[in-house]
Amino acid sequence: MNREIYDFVAIGIGPFNLSLASLSAPLRGVRTLFLDKKSGFDWHPGMLIETSTLQNPFLADLVSLADPRSEYSYLNYCKLTNRIYSYYMRENHYLSRAEYTRYCQWVAARLPNLRFGCDVQGVLHDPESHSYLVTGQHTMSGQRFMFRCRKLVLGLGSQPYLPACCDRRAAPFIHSADYLRHKYELQGRASITIVGSGQSAAEVFHDLLRESGRHDYSLAWITRSPRFFQMENTKLTLELISPDYTEYFHDLPEARRQEILTQQNSLYKGINASLINQIYDLLDEKVHDGDNRYTLLTNSELRACRYDPLQERFQLDFQHLDCDRPFSHATDGLVLATGYSHEIPACINPIHDRIAWNADGSYRIGRNYAIDHEGSEIFVQNTGLLSHGVTNPDLGFCCYRNSQILRELTGTEHYRIETRTALQEFSPPADGVLKHRPARRAERGPTVAARPLMDIHRATL
């Protein structure tokens, strides 16, 4: 047994906890440990499609929005891997998923506080020492381990969500999370159907559409959504992914928060506008060349899924929501791009009574991301959509959240936590009167001729 007492142990090493590890590693006197069952960092390997990109610019890396000088920044990664000038020449601020994964793996290899291959199987509380015991097994050797810590961070991520009518034990369908692993087999089918309408569905459809010229499959894309809508990324709308809005959202009644989230799907469930346009242009080109084997249909909800093992075909039943009319659809290959859901990890069952729960069995998450009754010992990553809104799954917000969590874990604000970042207001005035802000009196002085605008990026001395 390791006798050292860590200030906190984090379970799970995805991007959010990897960010926390990167921000905590340089802190003197802060003892941390991050555990994960996987053999190394691997983020959505089934969706590392060649053309897929992140929805956030490179500044939304693991550390820059908290500490731009960090050695674990994406720009430092580019510098140390001799890629910074080529990245500058590309003039593209959006990373591919594969590039982001390589960057995260580069960071993970340099952090001293990560332990992969550690399957956490239980968390116990020791009331005498006011500490937690994290127990489990090394996946390679089978040897047991036990670590003692004062506080916990849970960052176990999400699991592929399947519609209620789909039973993986009865049918060999594929969730988009496993797409690349089954892609070759899938392309040998006579017909392929994708169900879903978000970014993952669009990336899978686009990938199969691009390569359809080398194969004979027909391709269908069916979604319950009323349209293939793009992700909103205008600047004032993006301020809904800000500390200011998170504070406002968290203070609203729960019923109102639920209503708002249904209105904000396009903020985190939409498709990149560039990808939508690429799909349209490619479809248009193929159709005009006489290739008509593609079907796109909206407003259609999957109600039943049956698989015939003899014919190796799926029989799908849909309900068209606008027309209120059922229809059936047969396909040889099925990809469910139906998103992800969060599950309560079994390892925390022994400390169930120390955690605050909602009536529906979900965590009751405090404003500081704590879920224990004291609000100071157990923290969570990426499970607070209803409590904290659309900032919850956003990569660009993880540095701000982790700066807050680190402050709660250590009692010190190691990284500056901005109190206001938005240019707009979200709450009405406390006194019930909205007043104009006073104008700043213009200073009198000589008139200066306007200077011509320059392309700063290409400016030379």
Swiss-Prot record:
FAD binds at residues 9-15. Its cofactor is FAD. The keyword NADP applies. Keywords: FAD, Flavoprotein, NADP, Oxidoreductase. Signal peptide: none annotated. Its EC number is 1.-.-.-. It is an enzyme of class 1 (oxidoreductase). GO terms for molecular function: oxidoreductase activity. The keyword Disulfide bond does not apply. Pathway: Siderophore biosynthesis; alcaligin biosynthesis. GO terms for biological process: biosynthetic process. It holds the Pfam family Lys_Orn_oxgnase. InterPro entries: FAD/NAD-bd_sf (IPR036188), Lys/Orn_oxygenase (IPR025700). PANTHER family: L-ORNITHINE N(5)-MONOOXYGENASE, MONOOXYGENASE. Belongs to the lysine N(6)-hydroxylase/L-ornithine N(5)-oxygenase family. This is Alcaligin biosynthesis enzyme. It comes from Bordetella bronchiseptica (strain ATCC BAA-588 / NCTC 13252 / RB50).
